[in-house]
């Protein structure tokens, strides 16, 4: 099974490299640019998408640009070590937060990680809560996702290969319990079940939308986890989400003591919990075994035809 999926990935990669070279030729660029910039002798086991505050976790960090057939990722990728493991870190919004959620080049970000040899991705996100019991400062290790975005480039398979990848269980079955234990060991109130609904942004929800999401039993709302998590699956990388709750969404305002959502309030909660999130990620990386026992690495098996 692993051999078949490896062959499928090789075919896709060859197809994309060929497309890149053809575009380079049309632009009168040397065809070696792709190999020099993306197939460098850099390597990482684990990738992290997050905010710029996570740079301090990485030891012996160096930064590299990785060019992809889908354009450039959000920023340079920082390579180094965390807990003795080779790690690649990429700020999904760019260092200066210049890319709002609806324009992030999610495909380039995911592809760059794959080119570096990354097999597992940790995706911390700042999120709003749709339930009073899920409080600001808590963390949710999501187990399901609902996509409410529009127009995002959310697949590597626009043709000619028809591919239908299972996304029934969006997050890695091996990484989720590791993340839950790591966060709880850090003393963080952690919810091990949660559905995250991803909205287009950059605006927050209307009151009607928020109440609708909450009425469906969903716990968390965010703007970036899709298609980031799904693209990792298409590239057969494991993905785990860590949702830091920064505020209650607007639909909960009528409940006692709950204030309206604002960007300033979100950033205040995020800043006050940044060290806890970083410590939790360190523990996750430290406790992640090298061998994968999940199905993420064979996601393409039976998906193409």
Describe the predicted segments one by one.
Residues 250-303:
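His/Asp/Glu-rich mid-to-C-terminal helical/loop segments that flank catalytic regions of hydrolases
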Residues 3, 22, 26-32:
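Short, low-complexity intrinsically disordered segments enriched in A/P/G/S/L with frequent Arg
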Residues 223-263:
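Zn-dependent metallopeptidase/amidohydrolase metal-coordination segment
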Residues 39-168:
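Metabolite-binding pocket within alpha/beta catalytic cores that recognizes anionic/polar moieties
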Residues 114-117, 214, 233:
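Non-catalytic positions within long, well-ordered alpha-helices that form the structural scaffold/packing
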Residues 170-214:
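Active-site rim beta-loop-alpha module in soluble metabolic enzymes
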């Amino acid at each position: 099974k692993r051999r078949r999926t490896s062959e499928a990935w090789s075919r896709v990669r060859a197809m994309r490299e060929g497309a890149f070279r053809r575009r380079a030729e049309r632009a009168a660029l040397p065809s070696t640019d792709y190999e020099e910039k993306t197939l460098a002798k850099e390597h990482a086991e684990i990738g992290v998408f997050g905010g710029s505050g996570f740079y301090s976790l990485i030891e012996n960090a160096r930064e590299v640009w990785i060019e992809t057939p889908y354009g450039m990722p959000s920023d340079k990728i920082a390579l180094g070590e965390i807990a003795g493991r080779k790690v690649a870190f990429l700020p999904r919004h760019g260092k200066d937060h210049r890319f709002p959620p609806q324009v992030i080049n999610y495909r380039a970000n995911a592809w760059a990680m794959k080119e570096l040899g990354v097999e597992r991705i940790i995706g911390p996100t700042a999120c709003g809560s749709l339930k009073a019991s899920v409080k600001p400062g808590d963390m949710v290790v999501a187990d399901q996702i609902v996509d409410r975005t529009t127009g995002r480039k959310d697949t590597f398979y626009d043709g000619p290969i028809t591919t239908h990848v299972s996304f029934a269980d969006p997050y890695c079955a091996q990484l989720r319990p590791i993340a839950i234990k790591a966060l709880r060991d850090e003393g963080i109130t952690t919810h091990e079940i949660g559905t995250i609904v991803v909205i287009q942004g950059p605006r927050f929800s209307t009151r009607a939308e928020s109440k609708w999401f909450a009425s469906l039993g969903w716990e968390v709302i965010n703007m970036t986890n899709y298609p980031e998590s799904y693209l990792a699956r298409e590239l057969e990388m494991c993905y785990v989400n860590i949702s830091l709750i920064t505020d209650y969404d607007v639909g909960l305002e009528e409940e006692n003591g709950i204030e309206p959502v604002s960007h300033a309030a979100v950033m205040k909660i995020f800043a006050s919990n940044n060290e806890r999130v970083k410590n939790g990620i360190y523990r996750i990386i430290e406790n992640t075994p090298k061998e994968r026992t999940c199905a993420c690495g064979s996601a393409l098996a039976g998906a193409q035809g």
